[in-house]
From Swiss-Prot:
Biological processes annotated in GO: protein transport
Origin superkingdom: Eukaryota
Record's keyword terms, sorted: Cytoplasmic vesicle, Endosome, Phosphoprotein, Protein transport, Transport
Protein name: Rab11 family-interacting protein 1
Subunit structure comment from the entry: Homooligomer. Interacts with RAB11A, RAB11B, RAB25, RAB4A and RAB14.
Residues in FIP-RBD domain copies: 573-635
Residue numbers bearing the Phosphoserine modification: 186, 204, 208, 236, 301, 316, 340, 342, 344, 346, 357-358, 383, 434
A single GO molecular function term of this UniProt record: small GTPase binding
Chain positions covered by the region annotation Disordered: 171-215, 259-296, 330-545
Polar residues: compositionally biased ranges: 282-293
Domain C2: 1-128
């Protein structure tokens, strides 16, 4: 069976076949046994005890055609001569089928497969002469054409070798196996890679010795037991382990969510927000609520910038033109926008709230303001301004610059542009003071003249005209500066002098009323340019640049919506238990990293095993191409299979 035993016997005997395929093609010169010189012939193919019969070729004129094949397994030691002659002999018998009685004999031929394999090689097709039965007189019986092909089936050879090796033909061998503890049912260490072993690993009493320990003395091999435990790795390296890998079932209860505390805080804050929309503050409590003292930093929630509901700035109210605006509802919309890197409430955030709270009043009163600017008489404007000043002193006594038009421009100035705004505001104040000096000087002279002697009515009319001209110039300058200021941030339209946290100091209501009444002259006609000079924008709400405010509000709104959507998705996204991602949704970052590393290691091991299998298949394909390349070809005509008898 070994290659070394068959070496040196010709080019065709370098390998030992395991199977032989016999194809009976046709016959000629057969004797006629039927009516009209015909015969119903069929052939019987036999190797050892296996027999196959072809189909019957009816009414053939001595030349039937079958083209049927049969495959036989050869004994393992065919080339060494140890097999019996009958096991290595191919017998071909041609018979005539009889309707009644036994079939009639037409001829027979015998082929020695060992000699054919040694002399002819792998495949041979030739005509063989049919002979009579042994002990009978030879007659002319014709010939039969047979195609004989030797093959080697690696799987059968490997299994056959294992079965022969495990059989103990010697009684001393059986005794030796019992002493060594070798069991008949135990798997062999030399198991083939083609047939992977599914037998589990046995104990140390049932294991066999390695080749190195067989070289030791007989006493040690007979009475010593190996301490090694047999594993599936002692088989071929190409065999994948059949044991299943341990699977870890992850559950949501094994891990604690880090969003639970934040979810409870969000629910409590939303509940308190709904309950805090009641108007319970009176006009006496409003000045205390609009206090400018900065609150202390309180505990921050998950986002890091949300203020608590007890914050005085978030609960402050503003009275604009007699309409009370409460700051609880706008805060819920601008929570994400107020989360700044400083992580603490600031006056900038307070002024940012006024922008959202005063947009409705701006939209309602903006078309009415231009008509109120210059279309009324001086007496009517004085009465309106006095009533408005009284309302302002009641609502915000210490925050006059904010009520004079700063509510609609409540965006906080940037730290980078603070110096630039202060310079612009100083320039504007210097120009306004120069214009005011001209007006007040003339007004003081008019006051002195009125005390000494009454002036004619013509001089009073001229002063009114001059005051109107100065007022028109101030309006033109404001209109010219407005597009330049709109290009800057919204908060930079007014100088730093109008910022209540920089220039305005908190004072009592009485002091503010006295300071307001001091610059008023006794002449009622000259009060109009004076009030216009001190307050260039007398109304708290004036028409704004609609395009700039729309762009700013739209950009802020879209940014807020995007951030709110992202955070809501991060907080509210939940997986169903049937979803495969549910097992990984509650894992932490470190646990996910460990899981990925384990999966990567498992994949690398499987890739190594697949690579070994690919190498084995490549080597096996090379052997097939060398030994039996004909099995890789597609035959032009598939042969018929002979029926087994």
């Amino acid at each position: 069976m070994s290659l070394a035993a068959s070496a040196g016997r010709g080019p065709g005997t370098m390998w030992s076949p395991t199977h032989v395929q016999v194809t009976v093609l046709q016959a000629r010169g057969l004797r006629a046994k039927g009516p009209g010189g015909t015969s119903d012939a069929y052939a019987v193919i036999q190797v050892g005890k296996e027999k196959y019969a072809t189909s019957v070729s009816e009414r053939s004129l001595g030349a039937p055609v079958w083209r049927e094949e049969a495959t036989f397994e050869l004994p393992p030691l065919l080339s060494s001569g140890a097999a019996p002659a009958a096991a290595a002999t191919l017998q071909l018998t041609v018979l005539h089928r009889a309707l009644l009685g036994l079939d009639k004999f037409l001829g027979r031929a015998e082929v020695d497969l060992r000699e054919l394999h040694r002399d002819q090689g792998r495949r041979k097709k030739q005509w063989y002469t049919l002979k009579s039965k042994p002990g009978k007189k030879d007659k002319e019986r014709g010939e039969i054409e047979v195609d004989i092909q030797f093959m080697r089936n690696n799987m059968t050879a490997s299994m056959f070798d294992l079965s022969m090796k495990d059989k103990s033909r010697n009684p001393f061998g059986k005794l030796k196996d019992k002493i060594k503890g070798k069991n008949k049912d135990s798997a062999s260490d030399t198991a083939s890679a083609i047939v992977p072993s599914v037998t589990p690993s046995v104990d140390s009493d049932d294991e066999s010795f390695s080749k190195d320990k067989k070289k030791k003395s007989k006493i040690k091999t007979l009475f010593s037991k190996s301490s090694l435990q047999k594993t599936p790795l002692s088989q071929s390296m190409s065999v994948l382990p059949t044991s299943k890998s341990d699977k870890v079932l992850l559950r949501a209860g094994d891990f604690q969510s880090q969003w639970d505390d934040d979810a409870h805080e969000d629910e409590s804050s939303s509940a308190s927000d709904v309950m805090s929309h009641k108007r319970t503050s009176s006009t006496d409590q409003q000045p205390n609520q609009s206090n400018f003292s900065l609150p202390k930093k309180e505990g921050l929630s998950f986002l890091g910038g949300l203020r608590s509901k007890n914050d005085s700035l978030s609960r402050s109210t503003v009275c604009i033109n007699g309409n009370h605006v409460y700051m609880e509802q706008p805060e819920a919309r601008s929570e994400i926008r107020e989360s700044s890197p400083s992580n603490s409430p600031s006056p900038q955030g307070f002024r940012r709230k006024h922008l959202f709270s005063s947009t409705e009043n701006l939209a309602a009163r903006s078309p009415k303001e231009p008509g109120e600017g210059g279309g009324t008489s001086s007496d009517r404007r004085l009465s309106d301004s006095s009533t408005k000043d009284s309302m302002k002193s009641m609502s915000l006594p210490s925050y006059r610059p904010l009520t004079s038009g700063d509510n609609r421009e409540s965006m906080s100035p940037a730290n980078v542009e603070a110096a630039r705004e202060t310079k612009d505001s100083k320039k504007q104040e210097s120009k306004k003071s120069s214009l005011l000096s001209l007006v007040t000087g003339k007004r003081d002279a008019a006051a002195k003249g009125s005390e000494s002697e009454p002036l004619p009515t013509v001089s009073e009319k001229e002063k009114e005209r001059k005051g109107a001209l100065v007022e028109a110039q101030l309006r033109e300058e404001d209109l010219m500066r407005r597009p330049e200021k709109d290009a800057l941030p919204v908060a930079s339209q007014w100088g730093s002098s109008l910022n209540p946290f920089e220039d305005v100091q908190i004072s009592d209501p009485g002091a503010t009323t006295e300071s307001r009444s001091e610059p008023k002259p006794p002449v009622p006609a000259a009060r109009v340019p004076q009030t216009k000079a001190v307050k260039p924008r007398p109304h708290p709400v004036k028409p704004m640049n609609t395009t700039a405010t729309k762009i700013a509000n739209s950009s802020l709104g879209t940014a807020t919506i995007i951030t709110e959507n992202l955070i809501s998705e991060a907080l509210m996204k939940k997986y169903q238990p049937s979803d495969p991602a549910f097992a990984y949704a509650q894992l932490t970052h470190d646990e996910l990293i460990q899981l990925v590393l384990k999966q990567k290691e498992t994949i690398s091991k499987k890739e190594f095993q697949v690579r070994e299998l690919e190498d084995y298949i490549d080597n096996l394909l090379v052997r097939v191409m060398e030994e039996t390349p004909n099995i890789l070809r597609v035959p032009a005509q598939m042969g018929k299979k002979a029926g087994k008898m």
